[in-house]
């Protein structure tokens, strides 16, 4: 059954429509589920809580526009229909605590099953770059979609713009499908942490931060996506991960908003030509201590992808940064991929306890003009580097620098002089 928000009092207005939209969701939930329909028009809202068996459906021309006031995203904490236990012990990390201000979102789901957000072409979720001087980095506001401890999540068709923090922040959830979703501007495009069985396909993530991020994820497929960002294309780890048929390119359309001035952030400016528009690694390993990593990160295959203009092919600096200090990558393979415009060596610093197996097969790599003399790799605590049918362009001395011993093998290995790393 459909529940149109206009039947519950929602109108196109500068005034907040949060109460009317939430009433439609609650009525649908109490009736056993159905669709809550957002018709064409711009409806301004604070946080709305999505509940079990409810589909939020945006018709063509529908816009859910966030409030400019970050305090308007806290109302779910006073929910009386499904009260939250705010007195229970809470995790000290703001990003782990689902009730923290950092975890606010325009659309919030907690402990729900069978939820969906579906948008027809031409439907939008607009985060308005909501400015929060008490938020992360003293300017980030709520996420667009914030989901914790949920099962059976279906996302399709809508476009997100100007998300005040991550466009999708999904934690401790299972069975996630995201299809034909577009994200423009804002921060990260899609973040998952401690999630199982995730499919992301046919999406566009053109963001001001990472495209896809997260760790402690099992059984993930990412395919047929168009990727453009001002940070890492993939800042990710997990077990049993397939990334295929994706295209990533740089420079970024939207600069990293952290590089805006304080005045520009407060004015909710999207981007400027002076912002940082470069893209770092195509793939950076991610593994901090906000989650107990359940399985060794590995069995990751990246195949039939093209990366143009990234600074680095791969980066893992295990133990050197707070975001890379929990469990190292143990195995990753790039197959039938092309990298153009690289200007820094792949830094592969693993763990002596769990050394990495890193594989390139049928891979083409070109160095950026002006950086022809860069090393190809900088290695530490590795088990095996396998180089099969690796073709290089514009490298004058594609050496591999080693800090510890390990095996370098494959039919292309002879093309890479191996030298001990020396501090400059």
For each of these PLM feature ranges, what is it?
Residues 1-424:
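Extracellular/periplasmic carbohydrate-active domains that bind, remodel
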């Amino acid at each position: 059954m459909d529940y149109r928000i206009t039947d519950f009092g929602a109108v196109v207005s500068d005034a907040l429509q949060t109460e009317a939209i939430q009433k439609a969701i609650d009525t649908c939930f109490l009736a056993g589920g159905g669709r809550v329909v957002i018709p064409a028009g711009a409806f301004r809202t604070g946080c709305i809580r999505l509940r079990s068996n409810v589909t939020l459906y945006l018709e063509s021309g529908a816009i859910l526009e966030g409030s400019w006031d970050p305090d308007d995203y806290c109302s779910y904490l006073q929910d009386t229909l499904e009260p939250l236990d705010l007195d229970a012990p809470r995790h000290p990390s703001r990003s782990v605590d689902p009730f923290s201000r950092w975890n606010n979102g325009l659309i919030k789901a907690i402990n729900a099953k069978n939820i969906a957000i579906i948008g027809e072409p031409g439907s939008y979720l607009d985060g308005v770059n909501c400015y929060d001087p008490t938020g992360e980095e003293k300017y980030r506001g709520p996420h667009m979609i914030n989901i914790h401890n949920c099962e059976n999540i279906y996302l399709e068709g809508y476009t997100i713009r100007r998300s005040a923090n991550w466009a999708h922040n999904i934690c401790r959830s299972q069975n996630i499908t995201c299809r034909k979703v577009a994200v423009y501007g804002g921060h990260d495009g899609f973040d998952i942490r401690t999630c199982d069985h995730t499919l992301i396909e046919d999406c566009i993530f053109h963001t001001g931060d990472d495209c896809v991020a997260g760790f402690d994820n099992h059984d993930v497929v990412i395919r047929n996506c168009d990727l453009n960002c001002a940070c890492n294309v993939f800042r990710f780890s997990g077990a049993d991960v397939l990334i295929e048929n994706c295209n990533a390119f740089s420079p970024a359309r939207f600069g990293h908003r952290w590089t805006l001035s304080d005045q520009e952030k407060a004015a909710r400016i999207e981007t400027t030509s002076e912002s940082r528009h470069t893209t770092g690694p195509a793939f950076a390993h991610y593994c901090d201590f906000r989650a107990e990593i359940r399985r060794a990160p590995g069995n990751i295959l990246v195949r039939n992808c093209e990366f143009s203009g990234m600074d680095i092919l791969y980066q893992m600096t295990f133990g050197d940064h707070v975001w890379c200090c929990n469990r190292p990558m143990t195995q990753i393979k790039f197959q039938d991929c092309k990298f153009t415009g690289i200007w820094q060596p792949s830094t592969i610093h693993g763990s002596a306890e769990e050394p990495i197996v890193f594989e390139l097969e049928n891979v083409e790599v070109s160095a950026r003009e002006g950086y022809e003399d860069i090393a190809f790799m900088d290695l530490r605590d590795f088990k095996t580097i396998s180089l099969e049918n690796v073709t290089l362009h514009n490298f004058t001395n594609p050496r591999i620098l080693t800090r510890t011993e390990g095996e370098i093998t494959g039919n292309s290995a002879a093309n890479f002089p191996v030298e001990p790393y020396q501090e400059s």
